[in-house]
Amino acid sequence: MGPIMSTGETSTAHTVLGCQITDKTVITLFVILVFSCLVAVVGNGFIIIALGMKWLLRRTLSAHNKLLISLAASRFCLQCVVIGKNIYVFLNPSSFPYNPVIQLLNLMWDFLTAATIWFCSLLGFFYCVKIATLTHPVFVWLKYRLPGWVPWMLLSAVGMSSLTSILCFIGNHMIYQNYARRGHQPWNATGNSLRHSLEKFYFISIKIIMWTVPTVIFSIFMSLLLVSLVRHMKKTLLALSELRDVWAQAHFKALLPLLSFIILFISCFLTLVLSSASSTPYQEFRYWMWQVVIHLCTVIHPIVILLSNPVLRVVMKRGCC
């Protein structure tokens, strides 16, 4: 995942490239991780192709679908980076976690992770404004203004994600430069002091701040949306008592994708924070466990989108026939 990994101590979870790999648990987790990422790549790739074809045919795309295709594209690229990085660290478990190869992979990972979180947040904000049955003048005004803001919102998200990745890259590069100056000795006390300080304060602060802001925005607006939908559902069921079962099922189907979106997003955010806060060497079981948990969360949501979005569902049925 992020750059805060430690290899000061040599673990024997699995051996270095060229030697026999003995830890079956690590191998199993690695296979599960790669398979999960491949499923996510296929799911997000299908969303990109379906919406991209619609964009080409109609020469336009709704604001909602622009957000959706941006989220799918960021997740697609993120899963490809995750596969590449984890294949590299699986084959080179004792490599220095700030070497040039991992620096480049971390730069892409930091950018795409931040972009994915921001796009999810913007999608949640969009859902709230367009779907919520709130009558406050601000919400009524936003309903008409929001579609025109979507391109600028996406550009702002890309800008914030770029800032996150650049700040993290600066810290990564400082650690590697210090490591190179001291003769590539990861156990050097002075070098480790700088490294541990940056890992403990600099990286954690940047990531938690940059990830928490969009998560708070997402949580606030999705909470407003759920409250609005529950109130609307209660009023509808009371007014139409003879159709109560039919309406209850319809509302439940509408709420289910939103609830899954919220649960998966919050789960992924918490897992990212917890994994970033722990300095886990690449060789250890915990590193691979965190990876599997994080990316299982990101695998499920594209499937939910495919099953709940009418346009994508029709395209998927045509493709299967």
UniProtKB/Swiss-Prot annotation:
Residues 50-75, 128-149, 229-253, 308-321 are cytoplasmic. Several bitter taste receptors are expressed in a single taste receptor cell. Keywords: G-protein coupled receptor, Glycoprotein, Membrane, Receptor, Sensory transduction, Taste, Transducer, Transmembrane, Transmembrane helix. The lineage of its organism: Eukaryota, Metazoa, Chordata, Craniata, Vertebrata. GO terms for biological process: detection of chemical stimulus involved in sensory perception of taste. GO terms for cellular component: membrane. The chain crosses the membrane at residues 29-49, 76-96, 107-127, 150-170, 208-228, 254-274, 287-307. Residues 1-28, 97-106, 171-207, 275-286 are extracellular. It is found in: Membrane. The keyword Transmembrane helix applies. InterPro entries: TAS2R (IPR007960). Glycans are attached at residue 188. This is Taste receptor type 2 member 135. Pfam families: TAS2R. It comes from Rattus norvegicus. It comes from the Eukaryota. Belongs to the G-protein coupled receptor T2R family. PANTHER family: TASTE RECEPTOR TYPE 2, TASTE RECEPTOR TYPE 2 MEMBER 60. It is a multi-pass membrane protein. Putative taste receptor which may play a role in the perception of bitterness. GO terms for molecular function: G protein-coupled receptor activity.
